[in-house]
Amino acid sequence: MTGVMKVKSSVFNILRIVRYKVINETVVIVFLSKFTKHIKQMNHRWTVLRNSWSLTKRHILFVTKYSDLKDIQKELLNSVEFVVFIGDFTKSIFFSDYKMDNIVCKDEMQDFRQHFKTKYKLSYMGHIFVIPHKQPTYDLLTEWLVCNIYSLQEITNINTIYFEPPHVVVFDMDSTLITDEDQVRIRDPAIYEALDALKKYNCVLCLWSYGDKEHVVNSLNKVKLDGYFKIILSGGRKAGEYQLNEEEDRYYNVYYESTPFYLNMTDVKNIPKSPRVVLWYLINHNIVLFKTLTLVDDLFDNNIYYDNFVNLSTCPVPVNDWDKWHTQIVRFIVNYDKKFKNY
């Protein structure tokens, strides 16, 4: 089992008293929300240390400061190619294997992944690791699969089922692939052929519906989409910790599960579909590395940190428009593979 760091959401009880008067709590929250949003949009100067002689490639260790590396044995550290943190690098005596670079980007995973892969000409990245007792508080680590550095060897030893890391495409179900009617229908018959085509582009297809398991199973069976997806997830709309309640469909080799994670996003109306959940199930299906992560969903709020987001229109009833959305998915994948063709 991989060492997955559970990051609990912080709950702040804000009470401000100025000259014996209580400031309206809502005003304080709105101010802090705007201030936090402004901070997130700022670019940061990330220090990247690269060990070209590392035993395993592409994995990244995030630390708060360079001196945190003293807590890790040299043998383990030699298995990490990249060490990343915000701040200056004080040249030290104890590690001379690193080459230092800088990346300027937002404290946000999508932006970081784009800049990082472009900088180092990598078509895919390894896993994200932290030191458990010194975990950084960077925003980009929230809602992402963050692993314990001491589980690195275990993760490295997983036998992946893909020779070349795939692209991962996560589909919503209701009002995306099927209609919102009581008697659900397929959105567009072109969907079947389009899903088959994506597999030829080396894509792993996943489905994540906020509906309950019975609704998901019955709907997929009715519109004959039950054999297309490697991973099927149900539930996860509410914030908090979910019990891992899984049921295996042995015929189709998929799972219908609730998300066993604390979700960090508690201050929004709709809880987004956290990549952390998707990545956790991928690694448990021996899909260890991937190139890109795409979300296809009719709800804008469901997107957070995905490399690509296809925000399609709703479909209360069938509509013949899938070619438009399929083209957006394929164009992103083709352009990406062309950009990183030799990497």
Swiss-Prot record:
* Cited InterPro entries: DUF705, HAD-like_sf, HAD_SF_ppase_IIIC
Q: Which domain of life is it from?
A: Viruses
Q: Which residues span the membrane?
A: none
- Give all cystine bridges in this chain: none
Q: What is this protein called?
A: Uncharacterized 41.0 kDa protein in P143-LEF5 intergenic region
What does UniProt list as this organism's lineage?
Viruses, Viruses incertae sedis, Naldaviricetes, Lefavirales, Baculoviridae
